[in-house]
C-alpha cells in the first residue's frame, strides 16, 4: 500500500526506545507535518455513488430502498471476497470493482467548515464557508447558532459529495473538554464545561450535520470525537500517541464522557472516534469497556453506528502503548474490542495474517464493515438520484446566507473583557481620527481560521476592515507572534503610534503556538508582545488590545494597567473575523459573548503537571475548571461585559408555581411525556426579566449556575446548568429569559461514577455576579439517576 513502507520504517526505528515509556516524544504522523507517512490515508476526492440503476449491484438487496439498512448492508458485505472485505476496513476503502462498489474515503473534515475535500483551484468547488472555531462559537451562548452553522456545513458537504469531492461522513465534532489551558487543540472544542456546554454543542452540531435526531435519510454522518480522556498533545514530551491518562471512575463519568452520552443517546450520532491515548492502562481503540459496555450497552449508541479509530491509533495500540505484542495483534484487539474502521493501514495490512493465525474471524470484519455501510445506506449512498439530498449543487454553496452567518457568528462570539468607557468608538467627529493598527494579528487572514480549515471564499483582516471604515489607518506589524521581525520593528511601531490618536494592538497566540500535536509550555503573553504593549501603554494614548487565539493567556498585566483602556478576546473568528472585530470596536455591533474557559494566572501552568487528569484539588493541583479551582482567576469562566447596562430580576413565573421544596420520589414519579427519561424534564424554569437601562441596543447573554452542599464533600464551587441569549434588547425595553433547570442537571457524580440526586438546599444563580438567586430544597432519600457499569475488559490483549 502507498505509504506503508515509510511508516513502518519510521515507527520501527522508534520501537527500541518508545515502548513502555510514559514520557517520550514520538514522531507524530497524523497531521500535515509528515504527510508522506500516511499518503494513502490522506487521499481526498474520487468518491462516487454506486450505480443502483443498471450496475452490477442494481439487482441485489443493497439497492432495494424498501429493505432495512442493516439487511441491505449485510447483503452487500456477504458479496465481498475476504480480500475485498479486508480492503474496506480502513478509512480509504477500496470498494470492490468486481461488483461495482466504488472506493470510499471515510476521512472528511467539518470542524468549522468543509475541509479535507478535493477543492478545485478556481471557480466551482474552490472554497467553502469558514466559520469561527468552536471555542469562539460556543462563547456566543447561542445554541441555535451552532445548529445553523452545522446545517450549512452539511449542505455544503453534500454539494461536494454530489460532485465526487467529499464523503457522506465527517470527522466532527470535537467534543472533548478544554480542561487545561496549555492544550493545543482546545480551540476545536466548546470550552471547559462538559455537562452543559460540550453536551449542548454536541447535540446541536450533530443534529445539524445529520439533518435531525436520527434522521432518515441522514444528511451527513457526524463523528463524535475523541473518545475518551483526550486533551493533551505533547506537553513536556508526553505524546498523545502514547499517553496513559490516569482517570478516576468519578471524573470519567462526571467530566470526560457525559458529552458522548448526549451525542449517542440523545443526538443519535452515527459514528464515534476512539482516541490515541490510553485510559488507566488500556488504549481507547482496544478498550472494550469503552466501545461496548459504555458506548453501546449504556450510552445507547445507534445499533449500526460505527467506531473509527483516530488516524494511526490502531497502530499505537502496539507502539508506543505496548498493549499488544505486535501490529497484527493490535489490529485484532481493536476490531474485536469494537473499533470498526481503522483510519490507518494496520487493518488492511494485517488482517490476512490475523485471520490465518485465528486472531480474528470473518464475522469480526463483517461486523465493522456492515456498520459503516449501514450508516452510508442511511445517508442515501445506494438510493440513486431519488435521495432528497442528491440535488444539492455548487449553487447551494454560493449562498449569501452562509457568508452572512459566518459574520454573524463572529460578531456574536467576541468577548469584551475590560472597558473603561473608551468603547465603542464614536464617529470621526470626536478626537479620534487616526488609528495606529499594530501587532501580529493586525493583518491576519488565514490566522483567523485556526486549524482544520478549507480555502475560504474571502478573508477580511482587521486591517482591511478598518481601512474600509471612516478612520484613517496607519499600520505596522511591530512584532510577530513570538519574535520581532527585525531590530527596529518595535521602535517603528512606537513612532507610528505616537502619530495616531488611538492605538489598537492586535496580538495573542495562534497556530504557531497552539495546534494539533503542539501544546503550549506556558500561558503567558509572548514576552515580545507584552513588551511592546507596555511601551505603547506608556505613551499615554488611548489603547485597545485584542487578545486572539483559542487558549487563554494571563492578561493580568493588561487588566491592571490603567493605560490599557480596553481588552477584547477575539478567539479564531473565521473568514469575516476582521470585519466583526472592527464593527464591535466602532459600535456597529455590541459585544455580548462570555468566556467559556477560565483565564488562569500564569503560575497555574507551572504548579502541577498538565497530564494530571484529577479535577478536584489534590496536592499541588489547585483544582481544575471553574467547578473546582481554588485560586483566583484573572478572568472567570463566564466573564463578559456589555456596552449598555442591564438589570435582571426574578420573574413572577420563576420556578414551578413558586414552589421552594420538591420531594425526590415524587419528582421521579412524574409522567414524562415528550422526554425519554424523567430526569430530562425541567424541575423548574429559572425565569428572569432583563431590562436594558442603558442607551445602546444589545444582545444579552446569561449563564445559570447551581451550588449546593448536598451530598458528600468535597463540593464543587458551582456548576453550569443552562444558558441563553436574548437578541436586540432595545434601550428602555425588557425581555424575559427562561432557562429550564432539569432534574438531571442537579445531580452529582459519586466515586463509583453513579449520577445521584441528593436531598438538601440548592441555589440557582444568574451569572458569576449572582444577580438573581432562586433557592429551593430537595427532600426525601437520595436517588441514583444513572448507574455507571462495572469496568471490565471483554477482550483480553494478545
Curated annotation (Swiss-Prot):
Activity over temperature: Stable at temperatures of up to 45 degrees Celsius and is inactivated gradually above 45 degrees Celsius.
EC number of the protein: 3.2.1.37
Signal peptide interval: 1-20
InterPro entries: BXL, Fn3-like, Glyco_hydro_3_C, Glyco_hydro_3_C_sf, Glyco_hydro_3_N, Glyco_hydro_3_N_sf, Glycoside_hydrolase_SF, Ig-like_fold
Alphabetized GO MF terms: alpha-L-arabinofuranosidase activity; xylan 1,4-beta-xylosidase activity
GO biological process entries: arabinan catabolic process; xylan catabolic process
Positions of the catalytic residues: 310
Reaction(s) catalysed (UniProt annotation): Hydrolysis of (1->4)-beta-D-xylans, to remove successive D-xylose residues from the non-reducing termini
One Pfam family cited in the UniProt record for this chain: Glyco_hydro_3
Disulfide bridge positions per record: none
Gene3D superfamilies the UniProt entry points to: Glycoside hydrolase family 3 C-terminal domain, Glycoside hydrolase, family 3, N-terminal domain, Immunoglobulins
CC annotations in GO: extracellular region
Localization of this protein: Secreted
Family: Belongs to the glycosyl hydrolase 3 family.
Protein name (record): Exo-1,4-beta-xylosidase xlnD
Organism of provenance: Aspergillus oryzae (strain ATCC 42149 / RIB 40)
Amino acid at each position: 500500500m502507498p505509504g506503508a513502507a515509510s511508516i513502518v520504517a519510521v515507527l520501527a526505528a522508534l520501537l527500541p526506545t518508545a515502548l513502555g515509556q510514559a514520557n517520550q516524544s514520538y514522531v507524530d504522523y497524523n497531521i500535515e507535518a509528515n504527510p508522506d507517512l500516511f499518503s494513502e490515508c490522506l487521499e481526498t476526492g474520487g468518491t462516487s455513488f454506486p450505480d443502483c440503476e443498471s450496475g452490477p449491484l442494481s439487482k441485489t438487496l443493497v439497492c432495494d430502498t424498501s429493505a432495512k439498512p442493516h439487511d441491505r448492508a449485510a447483503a452487500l458485505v456477504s458479496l465481498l471476497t475476504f480480500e475485498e472485505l479486508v480492503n474496506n476496513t480502513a478509512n480509504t476503502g477500496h470498494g470492490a470493482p468486481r461488483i461495482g462498489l466504488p472506493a470510499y474515503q471515510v476521512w472528511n473534515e467539518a470542524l468549522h467548515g468543509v475541509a479535507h475535500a478535493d477543492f478545485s483551484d478556481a471557480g466551482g468547488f474552490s472554497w467553502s464557508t469558514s466559520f469561527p472555531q468552536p471555542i469562539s462559537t460556543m462563547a456566543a451562548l447561542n445554541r441555535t447558532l451552532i445548529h445553523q452553522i452545522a446545517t450549512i456545513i452539511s449542505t455544503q458537504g453534500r454539494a461536494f459529495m454530489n460532485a465526487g469531492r467529499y464523503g457522506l461522513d465527517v470527522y466532527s465534532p470535537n467534543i472533548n473538554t478544554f480542561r487545561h489551558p496549555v492544550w493545543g487543540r482546545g480551540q476545536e472544542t466548546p470550552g471547559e464545561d462538559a455537562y452543559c456546554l460540550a453536551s449542548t454543542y454536541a447535540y446541536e452540531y450533530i443534529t445539524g450535520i445529520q439533518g435531525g435526531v436520527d434522521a432518515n435519510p441522514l444528511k451527513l454522518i457526524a463523528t463524535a470525537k475523541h473518545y475518551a480522556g483526550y486533551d493533551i498533545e505533547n506537553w513536556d514530551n508526553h505524546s498523545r500517541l502514547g499517553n496513559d491518562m490516569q482517570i478516576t471512575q468519578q471524573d470519567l463519568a462526571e467530566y470526560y464522557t457525559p458529552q458522548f452520552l448526549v451525542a449517542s443517546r440523545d443526538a443519535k450520532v452515527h459514528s464515534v472516534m476512539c482516541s490515541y491515548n490510553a485510559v488507566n492502562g488500556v488504549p481507547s481503540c482496544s478498550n472494550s469497556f469503552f466501545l461496548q459496555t459504555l458506548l453501546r450497552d449504556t450510552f445507547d449508541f445507534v445499533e449500526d453506528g460505527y467506531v473509527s479509530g483516530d488516524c494511526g491509533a490502531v497502530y499505537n495500540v502496539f507502539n508506543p502503548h505496548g498493549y499488544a505484542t505486535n501490529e497484527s495483534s493490535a489490529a485484532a484487539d481493536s476490531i474485536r474490542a469494537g473499533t470498526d474502521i481503522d483510519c490507518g493501514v494496520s487493518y488492511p495490512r494485517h488482517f490476512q495474517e490475523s485471520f490465518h493465525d485465528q486472531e480474528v474471524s470473518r464475522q469480526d470484519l463483517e461486523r465493522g464493515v456492515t456498520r459503516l455501510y449501514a450508516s452510508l445506506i442511511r445517508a442515501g449512498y445506494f438510493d440513486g438520484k431519488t435521495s432528497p439530498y442528491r440535488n444539492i449543487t455548487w449553487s447551494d454553496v454560493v449562498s449569501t446566507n452562509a457568508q452572512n452567518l459566518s459574520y454573524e457568528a463572529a460578531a456574536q462570539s467576541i468577548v469584551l473583557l475590560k472597558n473603561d468607557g473608551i468603547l465603542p468608538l464614536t464617529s470621526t467627529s470626536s478626537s479620534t481620527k487616526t488609528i495606529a493598527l499594530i501587532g501580529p494579528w493586525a493583518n491576519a487572514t488565514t490566522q483567523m481560521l485556526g486549524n482544520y480549515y478549507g480555502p475560504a471564499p474571502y478573508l477580511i483582516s482587521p486591517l482591511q476592515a478598518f481601512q474600509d471604515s471612516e478612520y484613517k489607518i496607519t499600520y505596522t506589524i511591530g512584532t510577530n507572534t513570538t519574535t520581532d521581525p527585525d531590530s527596529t520593528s518595535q521602535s517603528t511601531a512606537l513612532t507610528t503610534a505616537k502619530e495616531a490618536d488611538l492605538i489598537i494592538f492586535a496580538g495573542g497566540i495562534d497556530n504557531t503556538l497552539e495546534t494539533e500535536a503542539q501544546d503550549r509550555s506556558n500561558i503567558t503573553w509572548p514576552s515580545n508582545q507584552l513588551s511592546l504593549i507596555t511601551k505603547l501603554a506608556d505613551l499615554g494614548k488611548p489603547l485597545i488590545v485584542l487578545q486572539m487565539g483559542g487558549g487563554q493567556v494571563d492578561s493580568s498585566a493588561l487588566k491592571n494597567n490603567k493605560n490599557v483602556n480596553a481588552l477584547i478576546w477575539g478567539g479564531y473568528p473565521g473568514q469575516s473575523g476582521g470585519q466583526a472585530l472592527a464593527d464591535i470596536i466602532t459600535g456597529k455591533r455590541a459585544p455580548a459573548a462570555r468566556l467559556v474557559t477560565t483565564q488562569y494566572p500564569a503560575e497555574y501552568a507551572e504548579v502541577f503537571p498538565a497530564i494530571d487528569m484529577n479535577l478536584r484539588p489534590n496536592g499541588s493541583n489547585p483544582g481544575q475548571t471553574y467547578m473546582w479551582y481554588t485560586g483566583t482567576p484573572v478572568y472567570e469562566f463566564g466573564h463578559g461585559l456589555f456596552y449598555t447596562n442591564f438589570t435582571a430580576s426574578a420573574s413572577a413565573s420563576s420556578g414551578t408555581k413558586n414552589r421552594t421544596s420538591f420531594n425526590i420520589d415524587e419528582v421521579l414519579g412524574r409522567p414524562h411525556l415528550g422526554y425519554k427519561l424523567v430526569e430530562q424534564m425541567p424541575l423548574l424554569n429559572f425565569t428572569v426579566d432583563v431590562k436594558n437601562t442603558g442607551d445602546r441596543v444589545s444582545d444579552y447573554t446569561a449563564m445559570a449556575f447551581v451550588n449546593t452542599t448536598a451530598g458528600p464533600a468535597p463540593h464543587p464551587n458551582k456548576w453550569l446548568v443552562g444558558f441563553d441569549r436574548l437578541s436586540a434588547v432595545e434601550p428602555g425595553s425588557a425581555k424575559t429569559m427562561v432557562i429550564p433547570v432539569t432534574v438531571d442537571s442537579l445531580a452529582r457524580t459519586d466515586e463509583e461514577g453513579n449520577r445521584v440526586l441528593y436531598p438538601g438546599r440548592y441555589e440557582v444563580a444568574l451569572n458569576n455576579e449572582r444577580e438573581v438567586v432562586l433557592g429551593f430544597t430537595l427532600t426525601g432519600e437520595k436517588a441514583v439517576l444513572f448507574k455507571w457499569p462495572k469496568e471490565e475488559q471483554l477482550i483480553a490483549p494478545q
